[in-house]
Amino acid sequence: MKDFTQWEGFNGKRWKEKIDVRNFIKMNYTPYDGDASFLEGPTEATDKLWGKLQELQKEERAKGGVLDMETEVVSGLTAYGPGYIDESMKELETVVGLQTDKPLKRAFMPYGGINMAEKACTTYGYQPSEKLHEIFTKYHKTHNQGVFDIYTPEMMKARHNKIITGLPDTYGRGRIVGDYRRVALYGVDFLIEKKQYDFERYARHGMKGTDFRLREEIADQIRALKEMKEMAAVYGFDISKPAKDAREAAQWLYFGYLAAIKTQNGAAMSVGRISTFLDIYMERDFKNGTLTEKEAQELVDHMVMKFRMVKFARVPSYNELFSGDPVWATLEVAGLGQDGRSMVTKNDYRFLHTLENMGPSPEPNLTVLYSSRLPENFKKYAALISVTTSSVQYENDDVMRPVWGDDYSICCCVSATQTGKEIQFFGARANLAKCLLYAINGGIDEKTKVQVGPAYRPITSEYLDFDEVMERYDEMMDWLAKLYVDTLNMIHYMHDKYNYEAAEMALIDTDVRRTFATGIAGFSHVVDSLSAIKYAKVKVIRDEDGVAVDFDTQGEFPRYGNDDDRADDLAIWLLKKFMHKLSKCHTYRDSEPTTSILTITSNVVYGKATGSLPDGRKLGEPLAPGANPSYGAEKNGLLASLNSVAKLPYELALDGISNTQTISPGALGHDDEERTNNLVNVMDGYFDQGAHHLNVNVFGTEKLIDAMNHPEKPEYANFTIRVSGYAVKFIDLTREQQMDVIARTCHESM
């Protein structure tokens, strides 16, 4: 059993014998049920550094969204010397470390695909290195090349026609969360020792190919851990041993995360669940008289400042899918322990308080793990932050904890994963709205007129028959589920082979559980379309080739989002049916299939590729985001809409059910206190029904319109809104995406 001097004052034994951060937390954290009166404002150092960073962000926006771009150096753990927000003020930074050598400079990351790395440069006027082009086209294969080498013609056709779309075949998959707390608690040498033991454990007689691969992966992980020490040494720190105090704990932990974002540009690069862990160090330092509350808040502010600075070089097609430059540096606060104790500490308040000390921001993607049993003071403080900043999302700890335990992280937008025990294979989305049109048209794409799906007999009747449509749709979903999973299997095989996340996996157990994430787009449109076919009369309008291109729906029909079981039962049926089909497919590395109802801002792109639907949505119009009801469908107010979404069973969509709601301030109350109390009551009722997720926006449509028309106004520089699964600065969205946000329902009544 190890017993480092840095652990003096900490309780427990089990976490010293084996890597078990959860046990360390359980034995040492201090729950807090008081109010927010202890919080401190920003220090002079915070104001100076944040002021400088805001100047750089303004310059970045003026240059078209990119301040600087690397073209000559391949990003890696030891690719750069030290970098600071401002060299002349580096002594002010209590947490140091940049992705490159300059703030907001975007790294060159070719392992996912050289073409994408180069296009990201040329899009913004930078000329990529000819030498690196030669290396990564002649001598070093990339993930992207590997995937396209083995794609079948059917996969290429489905991808091109966007019935499966947003696939991580041209960008890093992300969604793997290293347990960055391990660097602080154990030091890197101890982690290397444990990985070396695992490496030797797999040296046995009669080894198979899977053993060979695992040994190679562990060797890569050990190499990454050694390079982590070199990276930290550049900044003057020795992370070989555990952190001795809160300052070192924050710095060590951040170095672990920095290693991840120096080596991977995944669509989601989550931070994980760190607040309670760091609070333990802070409480010990308070007792020792070596830390003040002002210093503790400064430490959190500076750490969050670093998360706000994370940048990746992206191509235009990526930005269309994930608009506003998100990185999903998702960071969780609150939740309950399996022993019933609240996990809320003073540090959970401090992380939310950064939105007051430094203003609203999309990153980190602050996520409250919500339960009606959380301390009332904390619930009210979190709700107040939502009312004033619209920067926080909420996820139901009561439905996630029984599945993932009480030490899980959110690995992207809304998806849970056990910290340090699991990884998730990210799978983008299947367009179930387009699949419905394929069922009607016998596999012919309604836009391109190409035979994409199986050439089943199309529906030829003038009016759609519900039973016939359901039978054809069931068959077409069979085809889509199999093709979708096969495509993802290829992607993840090649990502492991050519763009392996060694630095992150080094901070995760070797014997890891894997989940296989999929996703659904067009959910509410399918539900409403099926409802229209069942309860109204839907006449098919066909073109000269006999392809259904529009629909004339006559009569009324129940719509999802109004707490009407006739529509809501169809929503449950759809989710259950598609998940059942996915679960029958073979998944890579024995991963466990899950699905999500989540679209990000890609609902606009998906909508462009999708024809008119029986629910009344027309060709090219955006799809409704996530599990949200269709635009204009909600007629009975906010609570009815929430009730409909809450009926979707989380166990059928363990990858998450995203629900984004915008509420007019006047609908919530006359002042912030009344709005805060009412929002807490709404969330208590919503989550107690078993609902999974809620994005909360509190503003009116008129503010969005003014921000769109006058982005130069100072008050809109950091105007942050919640969209499906993340937050974004509104003025960073494209005009088209801004119009989509404005078109969404803003509830004027409860």
Where are these regions (language model features)?
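Conserved catalytic cores of very large enzyme subunits
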Residues: 2-750
